[in-house]
Amino acid sequence: MGLFNLIWFLIFGLANAIVYLVLSLIFAITIIGIPIAKSMLQFAKLSAFPFGKEVIRETELKGKENVSGFRKTGGIILNTLWFPMGLILSLLHLILGVLAFITILGIPIGVVYVRMSKFLLFPIGAKVVSNKQAIASAVVNEISKRQD
């Protein structure tokens, strides 16, 4: 855990993570909300310690051919249901990001908020992985594209 993650956790991360953990528990009460609850747990992990993490789609991580059609269809339906709430949360995080960009010291915080807004818009099927894992996944996907 780096210094930025520790500072972020103490100032922003703990409160954000608690909010999204509670939101995850609320969605987990309903059966249809369990995938959203899992995504909110992923987001709580990102909001607690965001530096050194990337948000990528499950199809980018596993490859399009390794994700079932049922999972893709379910993700589209649930992301559509989530969209009104996700749009509000995403815009809120974008506004916070823009406000953070105003100061030079706030630029890393602004980058984090923009990354979070990307996740919140369509959370179903998004995964939080380390930067190294995201790069490795991108390399594997590019190699497989070139072989086809």
Question: PLM ranges: what are they?
Answer:
Residues 1-44, 68-101, 112:
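Alpha-helical membrane-anchoring segments
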Residues 24-65, 96-141:
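Membrane-interface alpha-helices
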Residues 141-148:
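Long, low-complexity, intrinsically disordered cytosolic termini of multi-pass membrane proteins
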